[in-house]
């Protein structure tokens, strides 16, 4: 039986589906709506040291700056569900500064955004396995909260090299795309396989129904971040997905039938 309330990096989630960073998760009002929805966690917009407010300036990094979220975190935590703070920076020092502040403010898990193109340009995290390992190891040793690393959909490194770099740095969680990466496996499945199941993998993208969520979870993915469906439907999408996922599970179990009936 699938666990729809997984424990990831020692954190218990009341539901395995949550928003993706940036999906209605920038303002206080948006984040409180997520906190009081059926989402299994509150995932913030990617947070930088200072505000990025010009939509043309920094792609997906527009946000009010880390102090805004440091002040907001205690209020978000009252909803009694995990808060995942997504963090981005153009230097390792920037990432550490923001991650430390948000961890001290009570974030349960820090998501390191290595997905954004501007982060690639400045940090070059995937120029080599050694560079990736250096970045995540330095951050991990400086931040008290457990870390998750969010990968871009296309990575020039091999999946075994990525998995090894994360594991060597004691990173417990990888956030990977659910879309196919090598013609057969999704990136999420490939990283899970490359780590021999030692990484907790959260899949992101490609899920808009309970049946689609079930298909991903059955492959060993611990939880799923929802993006487009949240933007399209609002936070009420989680109540729908929870119902559909329960129905899909019930249907799957009923079609198995009692032992010996096949």
What does each model-found stretch correspond to?
Residues 1-83, 89, 241:
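N-terminal capping/small domains of soluble enzymes
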Residues 15-21, 40-45, 83-87, 110-112, ...:
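Hydrophobic faces of well-ordered beta-strands that scaffold small-molecule active sites
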Residues 29-34, 93-104, 155-169, 191-197, ...:
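Catalytic cores of alpha/beta
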Residues 44-49, 111-118, 173-182, 206-207, ...:
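Glycine-rich phosphate-binding active-site loops on the catalytic face of alpha/beta enzymes
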Residues 55-129:
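Active-site beta->alpha loop and helix N-cap motifs at the rims of alpha/beta catalytic domains
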Residues 55-63, 117-130, 157-197, 233, ...:
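Glycine/Thr-rich beta-alpha phosphate-binding loop at enzyme active sites
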Residues 60-81, 127-149, 181-202, 241-254:
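Alpha-helix-loop-beta-strand connector modules within alpha/beta enzyme cores
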């Amino acid at each position: 039986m699938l666990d729809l309330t997984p424990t990831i990096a020692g954190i218990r989630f009341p539901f395995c589906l949550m928003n993706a960073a940036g999906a209605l998760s920038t303002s206080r009002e948006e984040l409180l709506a997520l906190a009081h929805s059926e989402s299994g966690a509150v995932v913030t917009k990617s947070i930088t040291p200072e505000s990025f407010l010009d939509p043309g300036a920094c792609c997906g990094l527009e946000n009010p700056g880390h102090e805004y979220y440091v002040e907001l975190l205690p209020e978000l935590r009252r909803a009694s569900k995990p808060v995942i703070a997504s963090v981005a920076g153009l230097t390792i020092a920037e990432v550490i500064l923001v991650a430390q502040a948000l961890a001290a403010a009570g974030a349960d898990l820090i998501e390191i955004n290595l997905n954004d193109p501007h982060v690639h340009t400045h940090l070059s995290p995937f120029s080599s396995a050694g560079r990736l390992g250096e970045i995540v190891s330095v951050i991990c040793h400086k931040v008290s909260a457990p870390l998750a690393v969010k990968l871009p959909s296309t990575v020039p490194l091999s999946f075994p090299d990525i998995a090894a770099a994360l594991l060597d740095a004691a990173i417990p969680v990888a956030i990977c795309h659910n879309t196919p990466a090598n013609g057969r496996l999704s990136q999420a499945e490939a990283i899970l396989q490359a780590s021999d199941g030692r990484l907790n993998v959260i899949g992101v993208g490609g899920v808009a129904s309970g049946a689609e969520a079930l298909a991903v979870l059955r492959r060993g993915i611990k939880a799923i971040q929802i993006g487009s469906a949240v933007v399209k439907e609002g936070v009420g999408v989680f109540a729908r997905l929870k119902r559909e996922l329960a129905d899909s599970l019930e249907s799957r179990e009923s079609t198995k039938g009692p032992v010996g009936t096949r």
